[in-house]
C-alpha cells in the first residue's frame, strides 16, 4: 500500500480549499440592476457609469420617454422587468403611484433635500427641476426679421406657420407638461381653443420631448417647445439657438427617482436611489450636458442655468396633472 506523506496531504487539502473558495466566489451572481431612464442617452450613460464605478454592479438601462415608461410599466405589472425609474417627470410618477406601481422608499441621503421635492410617503424623490421654454433657431429669426417668441400667444403668429415642433403629449412628458401648463394658465376652455389655433403652426409632434432639439438645431423648423435643459444643452454644443420664456409664466416639472413595485433587484435599487439623491450624482447631470436645477442644496448649479434660476413659474397643480383620469382625458382629446 502506498502511503501519502502528511505534508503532501495537507498541502493538497489547502490547494483544494483555495480552489473551491475561488470557484465559490466566481459562482456568486454579480450584482445587477435594471433601470428605465428618462434623460438623454449620454446623461443616462454617465449616470450608469458613475454608479457602476462606485458599486461594482452591472447595470442594464433602457432610455424611455415619459409616456413610453408609463405604458411599459403598466404592461409589465404582473412581471416587472425593471427595479428603478429615473428622471421622469412628477405627473407621470403620480400616475404610476395612483396605479399602485411604485414601491415607497425614503433614501437616508434625501434628508437634506427640501420637503417640497419629496413625497411624504416616500414614493418619489425629486432629483432636478426644469421648466418649459422656447428654442428658436437664430438663422430662422434673422431671415424672417423677427424676434424669438416671448409669450404663449406669440406662437400662434402667422410668421411661425409650420415652424413649430414639440413632443406629443401621448408619449412625451414635455408635451404633456406643455399642454397642462397652457390649460392651467388660460383655463381649460380658453386653453383648448388656444391649442386649436396653435395646431396649424405645428410642423411635427415628436415621439420624444427631446426630439425637437435636432430639428431646431439643423434649421428644419424655426421654434421648438422644450424643457430648458434640452435647449441649454444644445446651445452648449454650439447649435445656433436662443432660449426665451413666456412672460405669462411657464410650467415646470420635478424629475424624480423611484423604486418600482415588485422590483426584481430591491436591494440594488435602494443602493442606487441612495446615491441618486447625493450632490455627487446630481452634479453628473450638468457634467454630462443636462442643465437643470438640482434639488440637493449642496449640489453645484451650472453657469448656463444660473441666469434662469428665477424664471417666472406658474403655480403648477401636480395633483391634477398627475391624476390618471386627467392624463387620459387630455391625451384622448388631443388625439381626437
Specify the residue positions occupied by each region the protein language model found.
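Early extracytoplasmic/lumenal segment of secretory-pathway proteins
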Residues: 28-94
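A bilobed periplasmic-binding-protein/Venus flytrap-type ligand-binding module shared by bacterial periplasmic
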Residues: 135-140, 179-180, 253-265, 284-285
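Extracytoplasmic ligand-binding site segments that recognize negatively charged/polar headgroups
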Residues: 38, 42-45, 81-220
Amino acid at each position: 500500500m502506498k502511503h501519502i506523506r502528511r505534508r503532501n496531504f495537507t498541502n493538497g487539502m489547502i490547494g483544494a480549499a483555495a480552489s473551491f473558495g475561488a470557484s465559490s466566489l466566481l459562482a456568486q451572481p454579480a450584482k445587477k440592476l435594471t433601470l428605465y431612464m428618462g434623460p438623454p442617452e449620454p446623461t443616462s450613460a454617465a449616470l450608469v457609469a458613475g454608479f457602476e464605478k462606485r458599486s461594482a454592479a452591472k447595470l442594464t438601462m433602457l432610455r424611455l420617454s415619459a409616456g413610453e415608461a408609463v405604458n411599459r410599466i403598466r404592461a409589465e405589472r404582473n412581471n416587472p422587468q425593471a427595479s428603478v425609474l429615473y428622471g421622469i417627470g412628477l405627473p407621470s410618477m403620480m400616475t404610476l403611484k395612483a396605479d399602485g406601481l411604485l414601491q415607497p422608499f425614503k433614501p437616508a441621503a434625501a434628508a437634506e433635500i427640501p420637503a417640497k421635492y419629496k413625497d411624504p410617503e416616500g414614493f418619489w424623490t425629486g432629483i432636478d427641476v426644469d421648466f418649459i421654454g422656447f428654442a428658436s433657431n437664430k438663422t430662422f429669426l434673422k431671415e424672417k426679421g423677427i424676434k424669438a417668441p416671448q409669450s404663449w400667444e406669440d406662437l400662434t403668429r402667422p410668421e411661425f406657420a409650420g415652424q413649430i415642433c414639440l413632443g406629443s403629449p401621448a408619449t412625451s412628458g414635455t408635451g404633456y407638461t406643455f399642454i397642462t401648463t397652457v390649460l392651467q394658465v388660460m383655463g381649460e376652455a380658453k386653453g383648448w381653443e388656444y391649442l386649436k389655433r396653435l395646431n396649424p403652426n405645428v410642423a411635427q409632434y415628436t415621439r420624444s420631448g427631446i426630439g425637437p432639439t435636432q430639428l431646431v438645431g439643423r434649421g428644419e423648423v424655426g421654434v421648438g417647445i422644450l424643457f430648458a435643459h434640452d435647449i441649454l444643452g444644445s446651445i452648449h454644443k454650439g447649435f445656433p439657438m436662443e432660449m426665451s420664456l413666456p412672460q405669462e409664466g411657464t410650467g415646470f416639472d420635478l424629475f424624480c427617482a423611484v423604486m418600482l413595485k415588485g422590483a426584481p433587484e430591491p436591494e440594488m435599487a435602494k443602493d442606487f436611489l441612495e446615491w441618486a439623491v447625493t450632490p455627487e450624482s446630481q452634479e453628473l447631470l450638468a457634467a454630462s450636458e443636462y442643465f437643470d436645477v438640482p434639488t440637493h442644496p449642496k449640489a453645484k448649479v451650472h453657469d448656463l442655468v444660473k441666469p434662469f434660476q428665477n424664471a417666472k413659474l406658474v403655480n403648477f397643480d401636480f395633483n391634477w396633472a398627475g391624476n390618471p383620469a386627467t392624463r387620459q382625458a387630455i391625451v384622448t382629446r388631443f388625439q381626437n
